[in-house]
Regions:
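Carbohydrate-active catalytic/glycan-binding domains of CAZyme proteins
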Residues: 1-123
C-alpha cells in the first residue's frame, strides 16, 4: 500500500462507498447535490448508472438544502430485511451556500431491492 499507480479519473465527488454485485463494482458518491452511482467491471473504467438519487428531497424541509454522503449496506441476505439500506446526510432548509450545511444536519434512511428504486419512511 505504499506505492500506487494512477489508472483513471471519474468525476465522482466525495464520500464514496463501493459494493460488489454480479462481478461488478458499484460506487455511490456525492456530486454537488444528491447521490450518484457509477459502475465498473475492473475498478478502473467507470460509467454512470441509474439516475441521480435525491430521494424525497423536494418534500423534506430537513434536507432541502443538500443530500450527500450516501452509504449503502447490502442486507439482502438477512432474513426479515432483504434489502439494501442507504444512510445519507441531509441539510436544510437553506442551501449549503446559504450557511445551513453544518447548522441543520440530519441522517436519513432509505431501502431498495435493486439499487435503482428507493423507498423511505413517509414520516
Amino acid at each position: 500500500l505504499k506505492d500506487w499507480t494512477f489508472h483513471s479519473f471519474a468525476d465522482a465527488g466525495e464520500n464514496v462507498c463501493v459494493l460488489t454485485e454480479n462481478d461488478e463494482y458499484i460506487l455511490f458518491h456525492s456530486p454537488p447535490n444528491g447521490i450518484g452511482i457509477l459502475k465498473s467491471p475492473n475498478l478502473k473504467d467507470w460509467k454512470p448508472w441509474g439516475e441521480l438519487i435525491t430521494q424525497g428531497q423536494k418534500d423534506w424541509l430537513w434536507a432541502r438544502g443538500r443530500i450527500t454522503a450516501g452509504t449503502v449496506v447490502n442486507l439482502k441476505h438477512v432474513s426479515g430485511i432483504e434489502h439494501y439500506l442507504m444512510f445519507f446526510h441531509g441539510s436544510g432548509p437553506l442551501k449549503e451556500t446559504e450557511g445551513d450545511f453544518d447548522k441543520n444536519a440530519s441522517i436519513g434512511i432509505a431501502w431498495s431491492k435493486d439499487l435503482i428504486h428507493w423507498q423511505w419512511p413517509v414520516n
